[in-house]
Each structure stands twice: as C-alpha cells, then as structure tokens.
Amino acid sequence: TRSSAASDVYKRQGLNYVITILQARTRGMSLMRMPLTIWGIFTATVLALLAFPALLVSSIMMTLDKVLGTSFFMPTIIKAGEALSYDGGSPILFQHLFWFFGHPEVYIVALPAFGIVSDLISVHSRKNIFGYRMMVWAIVGIGALSFFVWAHHMYVSGMSPWFGFFFATTTLIIAVPTALKVYNWILTLWRGNIRINTVMLFCLGFILTFVNGGITGIFLGNVAVDVPL
C-alpha cells in the first residue's frame, strides 16, 4: 500500500540524517554546538524511525483483513452472510497502532520548526539564544514524551480510567519542556537588537499561534474536560 511504501522511504531517508549527524560532523562540531535547527531535525528523524513501523504494521494488517479475510481489526467474521461462532479482532487495536504513529508524527513536523524558529529569533534579535542547553533538552524531552501520550486521543474508546489518568498525566507533563521553549524565545527577544522584518514577523506570529494552541491543549489533556467536550 501507499502508506507502507511511504513508511519505508521515510525510514531510509531518516537513517541518512541520523548517520550524517552522528558520524559526519565537521571537526570541532560537538553535539552541544550544533544549531537548534539540526537538533530539531535529528530528534524528529529518530521519532520517525521509531513511529513509522507502527504505521507499516497496521497497514499490512489492514490489507490482510481486506484481501485475505484475516481478523486483526474486524470484531466479527462473517461468512456467507452469517457471523462465525468465534470472535475476531478489535478495531481498538487499529486506533492504538495508528495513534502510536500519529501523535509522534505531530512532533516529527513540529520539532524542526521549533529549531528553525529558535535560530531565526537568535539571528534577527542579534543575540545568542537564551538557555541553549535547556532548549536542546526541551527538544529531546518532547520527542521522548511524545511516545507516551498517544491514547489521549482515545479517552472515549472504553479504556480503563487508570490508563486515562496515566495518559492525562503524561500529556500535562509534556507541556513543561514545551513551555520552556516559549520562555527561552521570549528571553532571547528581551533587550535584543531586534530587526522587524518579514522573518521576525513570521517568528512572532508563530509564537502567538503556538501559545494559543498550547493553552487549549492543557485543558483538553484533562479527561474530565476532554470527554464532555
């Protein structure tokens, strides 16, 4: 299928990025001296290598269900118009596999943008980025936590309340490194020699849009608020 082919392509390209960053840096370019753009791309690539196999597996299983009549995701198997006596699979399994890929995919797209915006703000503020190491660990932390929040998309799927509590907690925790980035962006702008040009206006618009969306995520990450809404 197309998703299986796309998953394979992403994994092959991702290996090129990871190997280049780890093994082909120029002399004197340690990991903690790399631009934040490269850190964002590197972390996003590692996420892609870990997340896309879930999409690949779910695509193969769905194809087998459709073509060969297996029952990975179909709860009831029907033959000649009648349901067979034994149970099939579960559509909830597909939701887990999809969102295990789907939520890290959000950060696969976002983390390179975070790195790019960080470097652009630094350049057009004519000031080093505030808290470089903090920014690096925030990017890495967001990437790591992204694999523990996927089921907040499934609060109404019938999961155990304890699982809902766990995923609500991890969803709120991931807001901490995210907020640190905004904090560092603002302090980089503070008393900087800012050039108000098209690039800086786009960066400021990015921050405002990101903060607006992030605030809603704090509320909707809570089961008690998300389910009624």
Label every PLM stretch briefly:
Residues T1-A6, Y10:
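Single conserved hydrophobic/aromatic residue that forms the stacking wall/gate
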Residues S7, I38-T45, H96-H103, A168-A175, ...:
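Hydrophobic alpha-helical transmembrane segments of multi-pass small-molecule transporters/permeases
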Residues K11-R33, S58-F73, E105-K127, I174-W190:
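Juxtamembrane interface elements at the cytosolic ends of transmembrane helices
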Residues L22-A48, H124-G141, S160-A168, L187-G205:
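Membrane-interfacial loop-to-helix junctions in multi-pass inner-membrane proteins
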Residues T43-M61, F206-F210:
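Hydrophobic alpha-helical membrane-insertion segments
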Residues S58-G102, H124-I129, F148-A168, R191, ...:
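Membrane-interface interhelical loops and short amphipathic "cap" helices
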Residues A175, T198-L220, A224-L229:
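Alpha-helical transmembrane segments of multi-pass membrane proteins
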